[in-house]
A protein has these predicted regions:
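Conserved phosphate/ATP/ADP-binding segment of small-molecule kinases
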Residues: 159-246
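Positively charged, low-complexity intrinsically disordered leader regions
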Residues: 1-8
Length: 247
């Protein structure tokens, strides 16, 4: 739910509703490129979840393997930044269906039937301890079936609230990852691999990113490559983007 334009929360009495999420965005992008994409998650048995499923189908994403269970839809509230006013996000993910999901809730033989690539992000294991355990089960089950695993580390400090540090979880999950996607802050906070850059400054020292990628690959020999995104922030709504690939 987003405040209209660049307004503050409830500056006007409305919020714009859209469906999204780290893994869902990837599935939709792949479908838009003409690739076969399936989405696996746990959603509640209500009309809001049905709207979400219809949205995924609209973009060509296969939703047949989505599990329906108790709980609610997770929500996040977004206040879009402008100039020197930063964006603001408020998460409301507790007791969502995926937050309540636990190991054993998904039939992995069915979920991974016909699958050759599994993508996950660091957001899912951050939602709850049971979702973290389910995420670890997922990557282990994928590797048992020789499925390529990719992971966008996607560190979100405001989600890690259940007593475990992101690095405690993500360093274990990374052992099962073939392709990693991250920025320098993700690497520092999720893998505890440090680099000599100031991630808060918004400025890029491009010479250091090859060394950073190599350091990750040396630490995780199971990884075949890592893509590192580079963002140079001029203001809240003006950013320069680039990426590099280490293999």
């Amino acid at each position: 739910l987003k405040a209209p334009g660049h307004e503050r929360f409830f500056q006007s009495p409305m919020l714009e509703a859209t469906f999204g999420g780290g893994e869902a965005n990837v599935a939709i992008s792949l479908a838009n490129y003409g690739m076969d994409a399936e989405f696996l998650t746990v959603l509640p048995k209500n009309d809001i979840a049905e709207c979400c499923i219809r949205e995924l189908r609209y973009f060509g994403v296969d939703t047949k393997k989505i599990v329906r269970s108790e709980g609610r839809m997770g929500i996040y509230y977004l206040e879009g930044g402008a100039n020197q006013l930063p964006s603001k996000v408020v998460y409301d993910r507790a007791y969502s269906s995926i937050a309540l999901a636990k190991p054993g809730d998904i039939d992995w033989d069915k979920a991974f039937e016909g699958v050759d690539w599994f993508h996950i992000t660091g957001i899912t294991p951050a939602i709850s301890e049971s979702a973290m355990e389910l995420s670890l089960e997922a990557v282990k089950e994928a590797k048992k079936r020789n499925i390529t695993v990719s992971c966008d580390l996607n560190y979100r400090k405001n989600l890690w609230k259940y007593g475990k540090k992101a690095s405690e979880v993500m360093r274990e999950l990374a052992k099962y990852v073939d392709v990693a996607i991250a920025n320098e802050e993700d690497v520092q906070k999720s893998l505890e691999i440090t680099v000599d850059v100031n991630v808060e400054s918004g400025e890029l020292d491009r010479k250091k990113y090859k060394a950073l990628g190599n350091k990750v690959l040396e630490s995780y020999p199971n990884m075949k490559c890592i893509a590192i995104t580079l963002r140079e922030s001029h203001s809240a709504d003006w950013n320069g983007w680039a990426a590099c690939l280490n293999d």
